[in-house]
């Protein structure tokens, strides 16, 4: 069977099968499995995500309606009970590992792409995904509400996930920050909710930079003024030392505080950073880039299935979110390698009803005809190479 004959299999081909099987082996995903392998389960999850199915029954019915095309996509028939069992029992850490493998490939492809700044830009934020507490009783968030939280480290240069961490909704953002801000030599952009001076100092000690907004109750003393244009948006640029009883101990070094006036929104912002070499305008521009992570959260919630779930256990919910994140990176890889100018949203709209068609994502986006059929006898040479 030609693994590149359908849109779905072509997209999946950007995922290393050997790295996938390594993740399965590491977590014993196929131990005792008789019918549905973890890889086939993953492809069914892909199908459900990309076709916009709200339930397992809908996935099953959709695949039945396309049963004659399943072979070319390398998909077996879906049995609802087997699929639901896999949702509950296949360790979600398998798909977390696969996500990291796909991210590594994306970073290799990005290579030495032009960066906005000298250091790589990483945007940190978290988004709440609401759940019905009566169905997801393990996900208690507030009195009558359940939720999980997606903590994300977004590659600010390529606008794709770089790292992620999933937790129950109660987990504070700062804990996610500790999980995601471990890389040296980068610039982390953080919302004001992440201002924990001990955690910020950990970033400093790792040899990285941060840009965030200062809390209104922060106590400090001015050490010196940095020169800046009086007629521009920079109101002030000063070096400060924290003076609070706890904050002075938690962050003993000096910080830089930039006050910036946004003419468009008629609002003044105060940023703090441990970077003393970038211009004040660059500091403001870096923080403005934080909006990209909000756009990503909006995109993934609107285009992939991470608000309605096909299982009720923590493992099932986390598995579904990891698969959505994997697909977001695979779409970026596909767009980049094939030079597709269409947005990820436009691509998803085109492939939603053509997943099992004999075509490629590139063919869909450029209106080119699919490649000619390759018969099994010709595939012998592919196996021998």
PLM feature segments, named:
Residues 64-73:
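Extended, structured, electrostatic nucleic-acid-contact surfaces
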Residues 72-90:
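Major-groove recognition helix of helix-turn-helix-like DNA-binding domains
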Residues 1-62, 90, 94-101, 115-137, ...:
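Single, function-defining residue in the core of a domain
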């Amino acid at each position: 069977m030609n693994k590149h004959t359908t849109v779905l299999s072509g997209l999946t081909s950007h995922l290393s099968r050997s790295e996938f099987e390594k993740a399965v082996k590491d977590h014993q995903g196929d131990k005792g499995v008789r019918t549905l392998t973890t890889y086939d389960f993953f492809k069914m999850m892909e199908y459900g995500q990309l076709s916009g199915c709200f339930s397992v029954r809908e996935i099953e019915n959709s695949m039945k309606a396309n049963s004659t095309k399943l072979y070319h996509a390398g998909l077996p028939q879906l049995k609802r009970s087997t699929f639901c069992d896999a949702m509950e029992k296949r360790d979600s850490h398998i798909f977390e590992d696969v996500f990291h493998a796909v991210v590594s490939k994306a970073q290799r492809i990005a290579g030495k792409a032009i960066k906005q700044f000298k250091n790589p830009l990483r945007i940190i934020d978290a988004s709440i995904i609401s759940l019905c507490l009566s169905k997801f009783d393990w996900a208690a968030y507030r009195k009558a509400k359940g939720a999980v939280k997606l903590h994300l480290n977004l590659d600010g240069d390529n606008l794709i996930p770089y790292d992620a961490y999933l937790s129950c909704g109660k987990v504070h953002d700062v804990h996610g920050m500790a999980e995601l801000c471990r890389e040296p030599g980068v610039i982390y952009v953080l919302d004001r909710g992440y201002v924990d001076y001990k955690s910020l100092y950990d970033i400093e000690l790792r040899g990285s930079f941060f840009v965030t907004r200062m809390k209104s109750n922060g106590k400090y003393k001015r050490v010196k003024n940095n020169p800046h244009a009086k007629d521009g948006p920079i109101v002030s640029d000063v070096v400060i030392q924290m003076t609070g009883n706890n904050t002075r101990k938690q962050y003993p070094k000096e910080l830089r505080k930039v006050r910036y006036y946004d003419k468009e929104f008629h609002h003044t912002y105060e940023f703090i950073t441990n970077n003393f070499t970038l211009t004040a305008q660059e500091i403001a521009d870096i923080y403005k880039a934080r909006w990209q992570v909000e756009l990503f959260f909006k995109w993934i919630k609107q285009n992939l299935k991470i608000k309605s779930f096909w299982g009720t256990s923590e493992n099932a919910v986390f598995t579904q979110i990891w698969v959505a994140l994997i697909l977001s990176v695979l779409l970026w890889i596909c767009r980049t390698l094939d030079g597709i100018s269409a947005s990820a949203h436009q691509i998803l709209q085109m492939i939603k009803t053509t997943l099992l068609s004999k075509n490629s994502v590139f063919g869909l986006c450029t209106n080119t005809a699919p490649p000619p059929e390759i018969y099994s006898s010709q595939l012998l040479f592919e196996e021998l190479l």
